[in-house]
């Protein structure tokens, strides 16, 4: 899920907050979101991956009777035989099926959502299916597939190895990837902490831009151990959805656990462990450092200095809300700022639980930085349309005179530190070959002593 997706979800939440119904949505097939059919996300006790694969096979074979036998009544109402045939005709234009990838099953509230990559001669897609308790496909939609991630030029895979790891308490165990340089350690190590929302270990923005995978490869090639991991909001989305949670639950607690785990790994110098936080991860990095108490240094990438609600209002404006939606958004920000501790049961505001906002009430990342004596590097791409330059300037002014703090900006880089020209947009995140700029990898490597 990209930050844009999160904003659209928040806009919808604002409409509900104001009692406004969202108009019906029927996207064209063949552009952007290729098809959205059905409704009703519910939990299934059946084998969701097997059921979804069977539905996909029937779609590709254009066998409507057997497809309909797998579908919920709502899906059959939306996907009648005529619509099924039209979709099949469009799919036929994509050429022969060259490969069908493995199914990935996710918890999305009370549902199982199955994603299956399909590679055609002309394009690739992601087919997604939701399965309900009756063992029926209740939602089907086809999305543009991920272009294959290709290593940046600075990635030297012969210089490091990668291994799957798991860490954390039994209730919230998280999978991750540990990149370890070849040779004799001990090596400095970096923990990568992601941006806002249920984002993956690669900090993926769009379908092919994976800044943390770039950083991991680049730093490991330079002799740095790197740990990246799935966020709790992604790994346990079903358990988190609709329940009150805080910034500690979303990010801080797992980052502290990951740091403890990283220090125990073979080849790691436990006294040279650093944290690199992007977006929300950078905003919360000073809190994580305070909780951990052992970090050798911090890198804050595209981190907001202002309160989160102010940043979200800016992003909603950038997403184009106006009129009554804008009035409601501003009212929501005012409500957040007026929350008191006895308001913990207040319904979600701007898409986040009241306890989340209360947890951050009074949190000042620059003030927390001033409590730290460790080296801190603040990085900013001047083409960032998600975190305005206002925040970078505030970091510099708030921390002027702090000898342990270095701030650096890059005129050509965007929010994910990819180079470009002109105003940055969400479309940049979908551009093949988008990688974190080599100068950013170089600056971070030098910061950690490599």
Predicted regions mapped to residue ranges:
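Alpha/beta-hydrolase active-site loop
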Residues: 244-266
């Amino acid at each position: 899920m990209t930050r844009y997706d999160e904003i659209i979800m928040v806009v919808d939440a604002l409409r509900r907050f104001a009692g406004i119904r969202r108009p019906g949505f029927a996207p064209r097939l063949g552009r952007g979101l290729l098809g959205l059919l059905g409704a009703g996300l519910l939990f299934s006790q059946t084998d969701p991956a097997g059921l979804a694969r069977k539905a996909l096979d029937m779609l590709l074979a254009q066998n409507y009777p057997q497809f309909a036998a797998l579908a919920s009544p709502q899906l059959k109402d939306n996907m009648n035989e005529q619509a099924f045939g039209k979709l099949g005709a469009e799919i036929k234009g994509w050429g022969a099926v060259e490969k069908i990838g493995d199914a990935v099953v996710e918890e999305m509230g009370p549902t199982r959502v199955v994603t299956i990559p399909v590679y055609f001669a002309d394009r690739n897609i992601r087919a997604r299916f939701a399965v309900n308790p009756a063992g029926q496909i209740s939602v089907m939609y086809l999305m543009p597939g991920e272009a294959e991630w290709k290593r940046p030029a600075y990635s030297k895979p012969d210089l490091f190895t990668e291994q799957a790891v798991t860490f954390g308490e039994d209730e919230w165990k998280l999978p991750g990837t540990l990149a370890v340089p070849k040779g004799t350690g001990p090596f400095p190590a970096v923990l990568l902490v992601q941006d806002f929302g249920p984002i993956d270990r690669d900090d993926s923005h769009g379908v092919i831009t994976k800044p943390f995978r770039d950083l991991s490869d680049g730093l490991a090639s330079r002799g740095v151990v790197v740990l990246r991991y799935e966020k709790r909001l992604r790994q346990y989305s079903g358990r988190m959805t609709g329940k009150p949670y805080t910034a500690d639950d979303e990010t801080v607690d797992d980052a502290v656990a990951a740091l403890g785990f990283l220090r125990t790994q073979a080849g790691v110098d436990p006294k040279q462990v650093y944290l690199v936080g992007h977006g929300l991860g950078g905003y919360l990095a000073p809190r994580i450092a305070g909780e951990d108490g052992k970090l050798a240094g911090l890198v804050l990438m595209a981190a907001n200095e202002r309160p989160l609600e102010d940043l979200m209002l800016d992003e909603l404006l950038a997403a184009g809300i106006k009129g009554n939606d804008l009035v409601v958004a501003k009212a929501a920000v005012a409500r957040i700022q007026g929350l008191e501790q006895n308001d913990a049961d207040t319904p979600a505001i701007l898409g986040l639980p009241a306890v989340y906002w209360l947890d951050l009430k009074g949190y000042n990342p620059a003030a927390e930085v001033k409590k730290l004596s460790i080296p801190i590097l603040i990085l900013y791409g001047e083409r960032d349309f998600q975190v305005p330059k206002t925040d970078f300037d505030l970091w510099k002014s708030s921390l002027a005179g702090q000898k342990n703090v270095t701030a650096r900006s890059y005129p050509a880089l965007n929010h994910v530190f990819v180079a470009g020209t002109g105003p940055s947009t969400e479309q940049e995140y979908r551009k093949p070959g988008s990688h974190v700029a080599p100068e950013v990898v170089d600056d971070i490597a030098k910061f950690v002593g490599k």
